Amino acid sequence: MRHYEIVFMVHPDQSEQVPGMIERYTGAITEANGKIHRLEDWGRRQLAYPIQDLHKAHYVLMNVEAPAETIEELETAFRFNDAVLRNMVMRTKVAVTEASPMAKAKDERDSRRGPAGDRSYDEANAEEIAE
């Protein structure tokens, strides 16, 4: 079996359907004895240029190991699903399991926020000290 990196973008109004789509696509891969090495839901992000007068889309990244027939089925499913704006399937030489640069950047932002949620750790401590 070969390794593939798959990215697809979903219409922002259909974001609530993304978990079901992910489950359907990963199910097709695992049924064909494939493996999911990495699955990242990047959420809604700004597009570099408008697609169908849209400025945002919901991004999903998958790194999989699957037979070519299964990948062809996925590409056909992407093509006939109106909610999928764009998709890209690339064959890779090895399985990629480490976090993508997008996921790493998100983790860094989350760790910098500290335990207070949206406020920075210093702001939360300054308020506690002032009281």
Curated annotation (Swiss-Prot):
Q: Which organism is it from?
A: Shewanella sp. (strain ANA-3)
Keyword hit for Membrane = no
Q: Which residues form a coiled coil?
A: none
Q: Which GO terms describe its molecular function?
A: small ribosomal subunit rRNA binding; structural constituent of ribosome
NCBIfam families recorded for this chain? S6 (TIGR00166)
The keyword Ribosomal protein belongs to this UniProt entry's keyword annotation: yes
Q: Which family does it belong to?
A: Belongs to the bacterial ribosomal protein bS6 family.
Give UniProt keywords alphabetically: Ribonucleoprotein, Ribosomal protein, RNA-binding, rRNA-binding
Function as written in the Swiss-Prot or TrEMBL entry: Binds together with bS18 to 16S ribosomal RNA.
GO cellular component terms, alphabetically, are: cytosolic small ribosomal subunit
Q: Where is the composition biased (Basic and acidic residues)?
A: 104-122
Q: Which GO terms describe its biological process?
A: translation
Under InterPro entries, the record lists: Ribosomal_bS6 (IPR000529), Ribosomal_bS6_sf (IPR035980), Ribosomal_S6_plastid/chlpt (IPR020814), Transl_elong_EF1B/ribsomal_bS6 (IPR014717)
Q: What is this protein called?
A: Small ribosomal subunit protein bS6
Q: Which residues form the signal peptide?
A: none
Q: Which SUPFAM superfamilies match?
A: Ribosomal protein S6
Residue segments, region Disordered: 96-131
